[in-house]
Amino acid sequence: MAQSTLYSRVLGTGSYLPPDRVTNQELADRLAKDGIETSDEWIVARTGIRARHFAAPDVTTSDLALVAAQRAIEAADVDPQSIDLIIVATSTPDFVFPSTACLLQNKLGIKNGGAAFDVQAVCSGFAYALATADSFIRTGQHRTALVIGAETFSRILDFKDRTTCVLFGDGAGAVVLSASEEPGILGSALHADGSYSNILCTPGNVNRGVIAGSAFLHMDGQAVFKLAVNVLEKVAVEALSKAELASEQVDWLIPHQANIRIMTSTCRKLGLPQERMIVTVDEHGNTSAASIPLALDVAVRDGRIKRGQHVLIEGVGGGFTWGASVFRF
């Protein structure tokens, strides 16, 4: 008897945004007190961002991840103790170690000894984490995975640099994947090029208990823009090829929510109508690894994304990293 093909399938989604919603005008007013000039019009014209959410000082990345995870588990209707793999994509972990995934496993009360680890690919992190979990499930090593993107980027922003501090926000998004004979994740593609590591980075490091170098995010915006628009179409086409799908078969595109100009450029290059692109950057800002699962959960819960539809996700981030996945929801 032939052995059936094993897939990983999305059972449920969840997300969480901290309650402190900061509009462009509110942020501009805060910055003006330090002599930093910006405006709602300037931010919207260049990014499409109108607001973002910031976590309170006593709230950690694992706290955000916990709420998103609980909502995804509830939507998936699974026993938390059946989750034998947790992967958290984050660049703003609670600690250098232990991993945020291990902290989350404990907060969820999961005591089954399953694997838990973090993935660090910045804004591509969720694409990396999803593809990794898919591989573990397809090879039979794990059956039920919790995959999360969670960030508190407000902690690493220089609020004297208007070119970066207006872009980012905090939040978390999660999915539960489970082994299935029914097709789910159909194809993924991941890439990196470390020669571009300096165009988007946080150059500080811990040396003998002291932070050496800057602890704030640094970005060469023009270089990031040029590289992003160049690689995103290619990696999307590669993932579609692995999934044996044409772009016109994509029901929904969920790009990393970084900049509306990058997003619309990629959508246009793929030949997709703008109406098929999920956009949350206006309300969330750039939440790095959390942006894709946040947008996914929003569109699932408002009824746009329905069972059986094909969803293409793609992201690009510091490293330089980029990746894409195609799945049937």
Curated annotation (Swiss-Prot):
The segment annotated ACP-binding runs over: 257-261
Q: Which Gene3D superfamilies match?
A: 3.40.47.10
- Known EC number: 2.3.1.180
Answer whether the UniProt record assigns the keyword Transferase to this protein: yes
**Top enzyme category:** transferase
| Catalysed reaction equations from the record | malonyl-[ACP] + acetyl-CoA + H(+) = 3-oxobutanoyl-[ACP] + CO2 + CoA
As for what it does, the entry says: Catalyzes the condensation reaction of fatty acid synthesis by the addition to an acyl acceptor of two carbons from malonyl-ACP. Catalyzes the first condensation reaction which initiates fatty acid synthesis and may therefore play a role in governing the total rate of fatty acid production. Possesses both acetoacetyl-ACP synthase and acetyl transacylase activities. Its substrate specificity determines the biosynthesis of branched-chain and/or straight-chain of fatty acids.
Spell out the protein name for this chain.
Answer: Beta-ketoacyl-[acyl-carrier-protein] synthase III
Q: Which organism is it from?
A: Burkholderia pseudomallei (strain K96243)
Gene, per the UniProt record:
fabH
